[in-house]
Amino acid sequence: MLRDIAFEFFIMIALGIFIGYIIAEYTDNNLWIVVFLLLGIFCAFGRLFKMIKDYEKR
């Protein structure tokens, strides 16, 4: 369970940074990295709460 949570956090945040970096390279605006990093963190917490809710149902 703990490994799944860590994996979900890492994937969401890394994906956000990666997408933000790609957009930042094309637009020459590094603000996109921060925006997608925060979006990745938000999605990671959303997945965490969903995993906790699913775990409590069992």
UniProtKB/Swiss-Prot annotation:
Residue stretches spanning the membrane: 5-25, 32-52
Taxonomic superkingdom: Archaea
Alphabetically sorted, this entry's keywords are: Cell membrane, Membrane, Transmembrane, Transmembrane helix
Instruction: Identify its membrane topology class.
Output: Multi-pass membrane protein
Write down the InterPro entries for this protein, in alphabetical order: ATPase_put
One family name in Pfam for this protein: ATPase_gene1
Q: What is its main location?
A: membrane
Cellular compartments per GO CC = plasma membrane
Q: Where in the cell is it found?
A: Cell membrane
What protein name applies here?
Answer: Uncharacterized protein MJ0149
